């Protein structure tokens, strides 16, 4: 028997079975929770790279970084204020989030096929899977109190990063090989 806490501070026991050296929980009334993400409350945020450049959505719906004073962030709020939805995760791997923007239509950041883009969609209330192209794990960076990194839930070891291409600083998905890689570090300034 395994114990699980319930709301009235009592312990409810769940039956278990060993079958072929594997432990299985026996669901009572089919109420065991499967792996999934459940949407919680959003936060409105400005995301910056370590060069203090602001992430914004370009006219082509692409995520790029640009030098921008705070007053310009306010003037361009639909393109610079991101809606970070937090999700309850049935596994413990970090704070599960989606990153969306409401600019004409709602768009949500995706790393499908390891390519960063915005999909025209509202973040779903529930995602019945343990990985998704739109879920990232937001974590603090060890040794950096105010720095955040976002790991893909679909591609373990791959993080959102800032990369200079031609004259633009783009948001990309990158395998992190080195804990000192500053391109995968961001600051998140909450607006609400």
UniProtKB/Swiss-Prot annotation:
Keywords assigned: Cytokine, Cytoplasm, Inflammatory response, Secreted
Propeptide: 1-35
Compartments (UniProt record): Cytoplasm, Cytosol; Secreted
CDD domains according to UniProt: beta-trefoil_IL18 (cd23298)
Record flagged with keyword DNA-binding: no
Name of a matching Pfam family: IL1
SUPFAM superfamilies linked to this entry: Cytokine
Sites annotated Cleavage: 35-36, 70-71
GO molecular function, one term: cytokine activity
Role this protein plays: Pro-inflammatory cytokine primarily involved in epithelial barrier repair, polarized T-helper 1 (Th1) cell and natural killer (NK) cell immune responses. Upon binding to IL18R1 and IL18RAP, forms a signaling ternary complex which activates NF-kappa-B, triggering synthesis of inflammatory mediators. Synergizes with IL12/interleukin-12 to induce IFNG synthesis from T-helper 1 (Th1) cells and natural killer (NK) cells.
Protein name: Interleukin-18
Provenance organism: Capra hircus
């Amino acid at each position: 028997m395994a114990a699980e806490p319930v709301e009235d501070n009592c312990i409810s026991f769940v039956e278990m079975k060993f079958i072929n050296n594997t432990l299985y929980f026996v669901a009572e009334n089919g109420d065991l929770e499967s792996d999934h993400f459940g949407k919680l409350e959003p936060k409105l945020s400005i995301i910056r790279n370590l060069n203090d450049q602001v992430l914004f959505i370009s006219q082509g719906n692409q995520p790029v970084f640009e030098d921008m004073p705070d007053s310009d962030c306010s003037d361009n709020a639909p393109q610079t204020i991101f809606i970070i939805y937090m999700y309850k995760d049935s596994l413990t791997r970090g704070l599960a989030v989606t990153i969306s923007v409401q600019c004409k239509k709602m768009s949500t950041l995706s790393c499908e096929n390891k390519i960063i883009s915005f999909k025209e969609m509202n973040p779903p209330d529930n995602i019945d899977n343990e990985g998704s192209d739109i879920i990232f794990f937001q974590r603090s960076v060890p040794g950096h109190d105010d720095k955040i990194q976002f790991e893909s839930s679909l591609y373990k070891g791959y993080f959102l990063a800032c990369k200079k291409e031609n004259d633009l600083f783009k948001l990309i998905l990158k395998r992190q090989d080195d804990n000192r890689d500053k391109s995968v570090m961001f600051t998140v300034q909450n607006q609400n």
